[in-house]
């Protein structure tokens, strides 16, 4: 499956969606390419029970590791198509599965 993503990074910010149906987290990744430092930001989200687990994780840890699926959506204000990552699994710092969407 080409849309599966494994992502790890520092938690930059988090918030509930406007309608309180999902929890969003911005992840920051820093990496070197040669001697240049690059910083990338990714937005991940979860709905339902997984959203509450994601909120707990962001309060407890400063970093996060996830498995997710790429999702494309149309942002209504700007009418621009964007891509985000829907979380399927959350891992703790020891790489143990904390919560698996399939188990909920």
Swiss-Prot record:
Pfam families: DUF3217. It comes from the Bacteria. Gene3D superfamilies: Nucleic acid-binding proteins. InterPro entries: DUF3217, NA-bd_OB-fold. This is Uncharacterized protein MG376 homolog. It comes from Mycoplasma pneumoniae (strain ATCC 29342 / M129 / Subtype 1) (Mycoplasmoides pneumoniae).
């Amino acid at each position: 499956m080409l849309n599966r993503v494994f992502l790890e990074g520092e938690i930059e910010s988090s918030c509930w969606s406007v309608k309180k149906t999902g929890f969003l987290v911005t992840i920051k990744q820093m990496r070197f390419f040669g001697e240049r430092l690059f910083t990338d930001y990714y937005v991940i989200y979860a709905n339902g029970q997984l959203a509450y687990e994601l909120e707990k994780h962001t309060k407890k840890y400063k970093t996060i590791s996830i498995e997710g699926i790429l999702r494309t959506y149309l942002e209504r204000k700007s009418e621009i198509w964007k891509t985000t990552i829907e979380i399927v699994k959350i891992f703790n710092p020891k790489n143990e599965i904390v919560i698996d969407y399939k188990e909920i």
